[in-house]
Amino acid sequence: MDRKRSEDNTHENAQSVHRVKYLQELVTRVRRGDLKIAVYGLGHVGAPLAAVWLRAGASVIGIDKSEKVRVYAKEGKTQIPEPHVNEAFVKGLKENRFSVYDDPVAASKDSFFKMICVPVMAENAQANLQAVENVVSSIGVGLKLGDVVALTPSVPPG
């Protein structure tokens, strides 16, 4: 019985080591810009999230359905009053690590991580998931085996 338990522990330890190495490799590849991060929605959740990734050294693709938001982002600006977001956008643009796409499918094709940060507005106490569904449909067209999709929508309080 102890031998079986020892073999199980050895196998579990090997798996843990493999996972840690894999995660370390992901971090390295993100910081090198090999694995791009697409942030869908550059509003109250998406703009600060994109800025955090940019400050960490990642290459980020910003996507927003609003042309005004995209134009601002291409100038290194945002309408979100969060500290350091504009600075991160400007630095990312200068270092060619931040780009803004008009085409959400192209952003999906060009990225490894897809972060969905679109609003889920309440209508009659019901969430409206139309924006999420639209983004998911676009991502699906450009999705590749192994890609990671994270749903982090902004929701109203209450």
Locations of regions flagged by a protein language model:
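Conserved N-terminal Rossmann-fold NAD(P)-binding element of oxidoreductases
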Residues: 38-41
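Gly/Ala-rich phosphate-binding loop of Rossmann-like dinucleotide-binding domains
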Residues: 50, 54-55
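Redox-cofactor binding/interface segments in oxidoreductases and associated redox assembly factors
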Residues: 114-116, 151
